């Protein structure tokens, strides 16, 4: 073999090795039965690293092997809000800031949660904010304005969602139209519970857990382990469906810490959110049929880290704004189909990747 031929063989070998996708493990299913989608509202790379530093150098999010980035802009603004970004991720379409589950022309969009229901899967939502707030609402409601909380609450009765846990009780009970949606939910077979200890004891059936009149308190003000406990409860209930489930879990208040330019608030909420991520990963590792995806709807605060100590768990942060920013945010994926979540892509692509993972052809 002459040198020219030898180099050609080496080149082609390298192309074949690096140009092909790695084969799936024999034990890994082609499609996951379950998808757990966790959203750290306002959580950019700096927020994650601040939480990691405050947690003495480690987070469960480090265990993900497939990582990408999404572009977050909305249809009418370089800087998205949670309504537009939540809608983009849940339905695969960019929309205007403030719109929930609708395109810019106010046409309702089917969400991945609704499509999962149509295929016979169980579905659930968990949030540390009101369950009617922009991010969870974008998976289940269709309203032209994110502030139409009572209308968003009423949209819950138009679906077959199995579990939802979060604040916002007043939007179901103390309504201008006089309706008591908790009674209507009871008639549809839901357990209606307001106490997290009682909520955590439910293992089957339909559950509406309304844990606060409005939003749940911040972690340091008494919320405790509500997020991870609610995540575990939702997974237990939804896993009773043999066809699988879709669950969205939101750590809402990372965003609020960013709006306040409060680094301590941010890191306590990131660490709390990471505890829920750890529970989802534990479930997925034991189950082997579950895809776990973690991302943010946007970054908040323009956080920069000016100093810190892993040993002491201290972080020094500086901010460029009290609002959202336009930077890309990371995506972490684990489980069957996780390799499809690497790279840089639009936030709308998450919807397509979820349907592809399930093996659903409808869009």
Go through each PLM region and give its residues.
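Gly-rich Lys/Arg/Thr-decorated short loops/hinges at beta-loop-alpha junctions or inter-strand turns
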Residues: 92-97, 208-219, 255-261, 332-336
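Bacterial N-terminal signal peptides that target proteins for export
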Residues: 1-8
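Active-site His/acidic residue clusters
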Residues: 134-139, 213-218, 222, 231-235, ...
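Short amphipathic alpha-helices and their capping/turn segments at secondary-structure boundaries
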Residues: 113-117, 198-200, 231-241
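Functional beta-strand-loop-alpha-helix junction segments that form "active/interaction loops"
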Residues: 103, 193-231
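Metal-dependent active-site segment of extracytoplasmic phospho-/sulfohydrolases and closely related
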Residues: 45, 271-310
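N-terminal catalytic scaffold of extracellular/periplasmic and nuclease hydrolases
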Residues: 21-167, 172-175, 181-199, 205, ...
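C-terminal motif of bacterial Sec signal peptides marking the signal peptidase cleavage site
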Residues: 17-19
């Amino acid at each position: 073999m002459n040198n020219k031929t030898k180099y050609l063989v080496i080149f082609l070998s390298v192309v074949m090795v690096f140009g092909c996708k790695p084969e799936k493990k024999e034990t890994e299913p082609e499609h996951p039965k379950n998808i757990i989608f966790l959203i750290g509202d306002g959580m950019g790379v700096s927020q994650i690293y601040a939480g990691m530093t405050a947690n003495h150098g480690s987070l469960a999010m480090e265990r993900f092997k497939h990582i990408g980035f999404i572009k977050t802009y909305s249809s009418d603004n370089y800087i998205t809000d949670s309504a537009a970004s939540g809608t983009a991720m849940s339905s695969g379409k960019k929309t205007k800031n403030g719109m929930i589950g609708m395109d810019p022309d106010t046409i309702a969009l089917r969400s991945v949660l609704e499509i999962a229901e149509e295929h016979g899967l169980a579905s659930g939502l968990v949030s540390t904010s009101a369950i009617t707030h922009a991010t969870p609402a974008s998976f289940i409601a269709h309203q032209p304005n994110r502030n139409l909380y009572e209308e968003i609450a009423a949209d819950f009765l138009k679906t077959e969602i199995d579990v939802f846990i979060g604040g916002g009780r007043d939007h179901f009970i103390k309504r201008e139209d006089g309706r008591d949606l908790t009674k209507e939910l009871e008639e549809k077979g839901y357990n209606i519970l307001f106490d997290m200890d009682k909520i955590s004891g439910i293992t089957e059936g339909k559950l509406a857990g309304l844990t606060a009149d409005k939003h749940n308190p911040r972690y340091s003000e008494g919320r405790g382990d509500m997020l991870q406990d609610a995540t575990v409860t939702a997974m237990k209930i939804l896993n009773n469906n043999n066809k699988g489930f879709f669950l969205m879990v939101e750590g809402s208040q990372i965003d609020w810490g960013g709006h306040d330019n409060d680094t301590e608030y941010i890191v306590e909420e990131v660490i709390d959110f990471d505890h829920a991520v750890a529970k989802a990963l534990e479930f997925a590792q034991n189950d082997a049929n579950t895809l776990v995806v973690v991302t943010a709807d946007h970054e908040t605060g323009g956080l920069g880290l000016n100093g810190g100590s892993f040993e002491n768990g201290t972080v020094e942060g500086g901010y460029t704004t009290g609002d959202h920013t336009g930077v890309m945010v990371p995506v972490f994926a684990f489980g069957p189909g996780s390799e499809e979540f690497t790279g840089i892509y639009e936030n709308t692509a998450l919807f397509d990747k979820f349907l592809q993972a399930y093996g659903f052809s409808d869009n």
